[in-house]
């Protein structure tokens, strides 16, 4: 269960870090946004290593579904833009795929 917490925290750190660079490079904000961006992206990497998984690739694939869902929450609550029905459908498909990766049968470990 703790893995889900790590995934969610990592997702918001990754999104925040990338958004800091977006503010600087796309919206013309101060280059000082790079500092919290780098800190947030470093914290993202650290948090993702806390996930208990036999293989990093499988953990990252499962994380992808959480990341996509967190991105829509960021869109809604930070950028104040309402997600479209197609956004939610895309998230549902990603989460379904991540669930298959996460909970699918393992022939050999």
UniProtKB/Swiss-Prot annotation:
One Pfam family matching this protein: UPF0060
GO CC terms: plasma membrane
Identification of the protein by name: UPF0060 membrane protein PSPA7_1846
Transmembrane segments: 5-25, 27-47, 59-79, 84-104
Family: Belongs to the UPF0060 family.
Keyword list, A-Z: Cell inner membrane, Cell membrane, Membrane, Transmembrane, Transmembrane helix
Keyword Metal-binding attached: no
InterPro entries: UPF0060
Keyword Transmembrane: yes
Organism of derivation: Pseudomonas paraeruginosa (strain DSM 24068 / PA7) (Pseudomonas aeruginosa (strain PA7))
Family matches, as PANTHER family: UPF0060 MEMBRANE PROTEIN YNFA
Superkingdom to which the source organism belongs: Bacteria
Location of this chain's protein in the cell: Cell inner membrane
Leader sequence segment: none
Membrane topology: Multi-pass membrane protein
